[in-house]
Amino acid sequence: MGKIKNKIVRQQQYMKALHQKNKDKLERRKERAKEEEKDPEKKRLRLSENIPATIESKRVYDETIIEDKPDEELQAELKDDEFSAYFSEERKVPKLLVTTSKRASRKCYDFASELLDCFPNAEFRKRTGDIEVHEIAEAAAKRGYTDLLVLNEDRKKTNALTLVHLPNGPSFYFTLSNLQTAKEISNHGRSTGHIPELIINNFSTRLGMTVARAFQSLFIQTPQIQGRQVVTIHCQRDFLFFRRHRYAFREKSNMPDGIGTGLQELGPRFTMRLRMVQKGVWDRKEGEVFFESNAGEESDRRKFWL
């Protein structure tokens, strides 16, 4: 076909060949459907082998991936890590301090207000003067706070979140994207002040477990089930999706008991990406960096850290 010099004739020949190719493909599919109708085992075998390749299935192996049953060494580490007091019989109660970057906008304050509603036993303090994050963390630890959450803003857009576990770290720095407050979510509900359930999903590495335990330590471990509220932090390809919903029960005639269930989003919703972990209290200049992943520097799309 490439030897045909006339453009119009060449296009006609190409379309004719393409039509014949599609026709043959359709005939093969019809023939295969007839065979599979006679022998269902052929269809089952074909579908079992026809598994599409995804980034997750081609994931680069990470030796820190945690199996379904953690080994004794990992269990010993978890018993002595910075968050162990929240998962032991002691059931330490978290106390979170929320603040913002200097001279934050109204939208950032609105977002902070909604976070206070998400995290039980959280308080907000407006940031004044030139006090730095490590100084705020030191003062907060003396006043009995267990965690510090700082919202960062750039050009009146909330773009990052710093989470510091008190009094001695670790500290986590996340970039934020796709932020929507409750009033920006269509048909959103209103929270009732109950302690929510927490769903942490798909954290599979040792670093991922540390991040998951950091978020778990922000919530009281005894949710008030009657409130029917749930906070979900879902990890997919190292993106952390934050959502808050309420279980809703509605009358449905097609259900056996006449009642159907659903979810009503309460907000806010946003996406996080872990960029840095420091071993101690957050200090941008002198902090000891344990993990760092800068935007745009990912060498392999199949490599996941969490």
Curated annotation (Swiss-Prot):
One of its GO terms (cellular component) is preribosome. Residues 16-49 are annotated as: Disordered. Pfam families: Brix. It comes from the Eukaryota. Residues 21-42 have a biased composition (Basic and acidic residues). GO terms for molecular function: rRNA primary transcript binding. InterPro entries: Brix, IMP4/RPF1. SUPFAM superfamilies: Class II aaRS ABD-related (SSF52954). Signal peptide: none annotated. Residues 94-283 form the Brix domain. One of its GO terms (biological process) is maturation of 5.8S rRNA from tricistronic rRNA transcript (SSU-rRNA, 5.8S rRNA, LSU-rRNA). This is Brix domain-containing protein C4F8.04. It comes from Schizosaccharomyces pombe (strain 972 / ATCC 24843).
